[in-house]
A protein has these predicted regions:
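Short catalytic/ligand-binding loop motif for oxyanion handling, primarily in non-cytosolic enzymes
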Residues: 69-70, 93-96, 123-127, 157, ...
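Eukaryote-specific, low-hydrophobicity, charge-rich regions
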Residues: 30-61, 74-84, 113
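Residues that flank catalytic or metal-binding motifs in active/ligand-binding sites
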Residues: 55, 102, 142-145, 184-188, ...
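Short helix-loop capping/hinge motifs at secondary-structure junctions, enriched
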Residues: 153-158, 199, 302-305
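Acidic-and-aromatic substrate-binding clefts and catalytic sites of carbohydrate-active enzymes
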Residues: 63-71, 92-97, 180, 210-213, ...
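Active site of divalent-metal-dependent phosphoester/diester hydrolases
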Residues: 4, 113-148, 243-319
Length: 331
């Protein structure tokens, strides 16, 4: 279990210097990751407006691509009435998003509680297109992670780390050498009060710079974590699973083994609507990139309907390079 805190502890200048000077090895990365408090806790805040979920409720999963526009993004989803949002790629104290706590900003705008956990402490300002959004020369906190927003209070919340070897820290692991980071992929899990009892919700983001077997192992760890954290409880998992990314020629999302592994453990993938979920954006202006990366699955719940929410605002501006996936379920 990871502790729940009202505020994550910023890295000190000494800790930042230690990270910069550390050898780029998995051993060094694991040692750093283990002793940084911010990487091993879940920040919980905001204010919920309901006592429990409706019997029929809507959940939305969205990779917000750093969340350049937290208030616009909140306004974009509000008409759909989701009671739970499963968010990934949320910045906190990053120059490219004006040092904002994007999760807290969205939660406040929607009148929701939130749980946020750090995937990565980013040692730089990001890629070339991201740096064009930076007004400062450094990151105040340097955090990037996943979150859950909820219209009801959290009964409990935790984080599962899905790897610790330093995929974006060690030069031979496969991450982008131009974006060095401490941390790794994670999942934020929360127990929320449903109409007929507690329900477990999970927001996750699997590895992009890896093959399908790597992601399948990460999803196995996630499911194992859920079984320990919320045994015998209905579960909803949502997020950017990066299905089909870094695949060999001829393969795509259909060849990912995580689908069958989850199905064998009782998870239903029919919550996810048909269609690709990526689009060109301000950070990722690649019109040819059309992929199905974003998913919802559940165990012990009935899906009533689902939909894709395009990430274009009223002016046609892309809020993200991912569209959101929604499902209405009966608890």
């Amino acid at each position: 279990m990871r502790p729940r805190v009202p505020r994550l502890q910023p890295l000190s200048e000494a800790e930042r210097a230690e990270i910069s000077a550390a050898p780029r090895t998995s051993t060094a990365h694991r040692a750093l990751l283990a002793r940084l408090p911010a990487m091993n806790a879940v920040e919980c805040g905001g204010q919920a407006g309901l006592a429990h979920l409706h019997r029929d409720f809507t959940v939305l999963a969205w990779n917000l691509e750093r969340c350049l526009f937290p208030l616009d993004s909140a306004a974009h989803v509000a008409p759909k009435g989701p009671q739970v949002l499963l968010l990934s790629e949320m910045d906190h104290g990053m120059a490219r998003t004006k040092q904002r706590h994007t999760t807290e900003d969205m939660a406040r705008a929607l009148g929701m509680a939130y749980a946020f956990g750090v995937e990565f402490f980013e040692m730089g300002l990001g890629g070339a297109t991201e740096r064009s959004f930076c007004e400062d020369d450094d990151n105040r906190l340097g955090w990037h992670g996943n979150a859950i927003l909820s219209a009801v209070p959290f009964e409990d919340a935790t984080m599962f780390r899905l790897d610790d070897h330093g995929h974006w820290f060690t030069p031979d692991a496969g991450g982008d050498a131009g974006q060095p980071r401490i941390g790794g992929r994670n999942a934020i899990a929360a127990i929320l009060p449903g109409a007929d009892g507690p329900i477990c919700f999970v927001s996750t983001h699997l590895e992009s710079n890896a093959r399908a077997d790597h992601r399948a192992t990460q999803f196995d760890r996630l499911m194992d974590g859920v079984d320990r954290f919320a045994p015998d409880m209905p579960v909803i998992i949502g997020g950017d699973l990066n299905t089909g990314n870094s695949a060999p020629p001829g393969d795509d999302w259909r060849d990912e083994p995580l689908f069958d592994r989850a199905g064998a453990r009782g998870y239903d993938w029919s919550l996810t609507p048909a269609g690709v979920t990526t689009r060109p954006s301000l950070i990722t202006p690649h019109p040819a990139r059309r992929m199905k990366l974003d998913w919802l699955c559940a165990r012990g719940l009935t899906c009533l309907r689902n939909a894709l929410l395009p990430s274009l605002d009223a002016t046609g501006t892309p809020l993200s390079d991912h569209d959101a996936v929604l499902a209405t379920l009966r608890g």
